[in-house]
């Protein structure tokens, strides 16, 4: 394997083991996966990646793992073809745990800069996973609770005597 693919395999290993104490060795301080912004909009770098690993294990159980299907590279880019296996045990964008097992293929595009992972986009099989989970509905609070409606203030200037 190439050094770039080895870096991506370290990323996959972190997702599989949940071990994140060494991610600064292979995740650049500018790391960003736009798909993770929903969970931690302010985080970047190794901390953002570690939070994504923690979330994966929280939502899909400690046994969740990525199976390596194949890797390709083109310049600074690595394309990883993976399959995620897990069990829905935690809140998933407002949908309470179903306990159901699922699997789904994914494509990850990863850019290596200065010998570390900088950019990461992933496209999981959302539809297939959703169906395997039994097509659950979010709780009333959803994944983005609505703020309470603004309190109406009484405008005394319109009062008539």
UniProtKB/Swiss-Prot annotation:
Region (Disordered): which ranges?
137-161
What is catalyzed by this enzyme? methyl aklanonate = aklaviketone
| Function noted in UniProt | Involved in the biosynthesis of aklavinone which is an important precursor common to the formation of the clinically significant anthracyclines such as carminomycin, daunorubicin (daunomycin), rhodomycin, aclacinomycin T (aklavin) and aclacinomycin A (aclarubicin). These compounds are aromatic polyketide antibiotics that exhibit high cytotoxicity and are widely applied in the chemotherapy of a variety of cancers. Catalyzes the cyclization of aklanonic acid methyl ester to yield aklaviketone.
Residues reported in the UniProt entry to bind substrate: 106
What does the pH dependence annotation say? Optimum pH is between 6 and 7.5.
Subunit note: Homotetramer.
Classification via NCBIfam families: SnoaL_meth_ester
* Name the record gives this protein: Aklanonic acid methyl ester cyclase DauD
Query: Known SUPFAM superfamilies for this protein?
Result: NTF2-like (SSF54427)
Entry GO MF terms: intramolecular lyase activity
Instruction: Tell me the keywords, alphabetical order.
Output: Antibiotic biosynthesis, Isomerase
EC annotation from Swiss-Prot or TrEMBL: 5.5.1.23
Q: Which domain of life is it from?
A: Bacteria
Q: Which species is this record about?
A: Streptomyces sp. (strain C5)
Keyword Lipid metabolism included in the entry's annotation = no
Q: Which family does it belong to?
A: Belongs to the polyketide cyclase DnrD family.
What the record says about disrupting the gene is: Cells lacking this gene accumulate aklanonic acid methyl ester.
UniProt keyword annotation of Isomerase present: yes
Q: Which pathway is recorded for this entry?
A: Antibiotic biosynthesis; daunorubicin biosynthesis; Antibiotic biosynthesis; carminomycin biosynthesis; Antibiotic biosynthesis; rhodomycin biosynthesis; Antibiotic biosynthesis; aclacinomycin biosynthesis
GO process annotations (BP) = antibiotic biosynthetic process; daunorubicin biosynthetic process; doxorubicin metabolic process
Gene3D superfamilies (UniProt xref): 3.10.450.50
